[in-house]
Amino acid sequence: MLAEKYIPKGTNGYKNLSGFFKNFDRIFTLKPLRWFPLWTVLVAGNNISEHLNDRWFYWNWSSFNLYLLFLLVLIPYVDNRLKSRFDFASQLSSITDYLKCVVYASIIMLLGSNPLSISLTTLIYSVPYVLFFLAGVLTWSINIDQENGEKFYKKDIYKLLIIVVALSLLASFLGFSNDDPMISTVAAIYIPFPLVALVFPAAIRHLQRSRSYAVFIPAMFLSMRFPWFFFLLVPLFVLSRHYFYFTSGKIYPTFKVDTPEEVSS
């Protein structure tokens, strides 16, 4: 990040900008990092409707409308107000948790699809998307924070990784069966990340990649059909990185995987 290079911590410039970015504290109490997956699920729902209308739908600026704008604002607000239990740092520990997660993602997707135009075909096309996003949530539910000195073992997470790989494979297969190039390709490209974490010698960096790309890959592919979506994601990403750097000294969110610690076998 250029700010880290040219405005290192401890300099006067860093201190001045720290004061400036503290003005965004109230915005970040809304947990805007959660907006990335929430918006992605929402736009994925709209993608299904657009795909059913036009299989070759691509790079269409006119896909943005007041209905989507309303939902892009409303859903993060409601999510924050409800203090959803599906925090990506928490554990999903029961079948009930998984079912609630599926219902939660399904509702957001169907809202994105526009409830007034929902059909059986829409529901069928939604299934692989929900399966993929469930795989993403399961990946994020694996706690990789070792700052408190606690260790975790690969034997404690390999079952989850198997489920993640299986869900991604199923999502890709169902997408291919539906002739939906979006989810079939997204899931297929994502599969190697949890597969590496499952098969190769255990390392935190494999899980970090699996987490990041569970959101990044679908978001970027959706941006190819909804170009305006890209211009929502980039400013939020840049603002978040600079906010956390100038208020806490950490560069986050990031795709950099520099954690050297290995996971015990």
Model-flagged regions — what are they?
Residues 65-76, 128-139, 161-171, 185-199:
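Generic alpha-helical transmembrane segments
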Residues 1-128:
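N-terminal topogenic module of multi-pass integral membrane proteins
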Residues 91-107, 129-134, 154-169, 216-222:
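Transmembrane alpha-helical segments of multi-pass membrane proteins
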Residues 42-44, 104-110, 165-173, 191-198, ...:
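Hydrophobic, membrane-inserted alpha-helices
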Residues 187-265:
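C-terminal transmembrane-bundle signature of multipass membrane proteins
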